[in-house]
Amino acid sequence: MPITDQTILSEIQRLTIEGVGDGGATWPSGMWTQVEVLGYLTQVQNRFLSETGVRWTRLETALTLLQTNQAAPADWMTTIFIAFKDAAGLYSELPKLDAQELDYIQSSWPGATAARPRGYYETDGDTLTTYVVPAPTAAASALERYYVALGTAFTAAGVNFSVPDEYVPTIKYGCLAEMFGKIGPAQNLVLAEMCEERWTEGLEIAKLQAPSSWFVM
């Protein structure tokens, strides 16, 4: 049975002496709010997914012809692998490149076109954009993307975790590290450090599992 946010929020409430646990609805001490804790939990889960790559998503997106910048999926966080698919359904890997590599491969790449791209690159500026070079001209072509997607945002309404069940405690301790590390009356750096250690342990174990990751179709 999947673990929900209400279950973990109740555990967090009991650990922080915020009552017996009501699924994260109330925080009597006033040191944290429901919105704040839900934000911590969601952010920590996304960080875990991005850093470990234990859960991949596969998605095919049609290429916009004669254009280098291709829109990435709205839930994209990190690219794992991209392949070019032609009209005949044949796939070929697109290597990840940077601007210097592209300069060596084809000095005119910023405005060049070709039936199929030779690679892709991503920049920090446009996080939901994948650049393919040269700009593709082949009709009915597409990108086959394998990427790490954002986890489901928590709402305290019984949302399932987006990580395998065995790593839910890791997310819990990551959330607690954020809660105890905040500036203000709730700050307890000793507890924050202890929770951070538990978080780090789970994170490193998950990285070992990443090569045997599974897909969300």
Model-inferred region functions:
Residues M1-M217:
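Glycine-enriched, solvent-exposed interface loops adjoining structured elements
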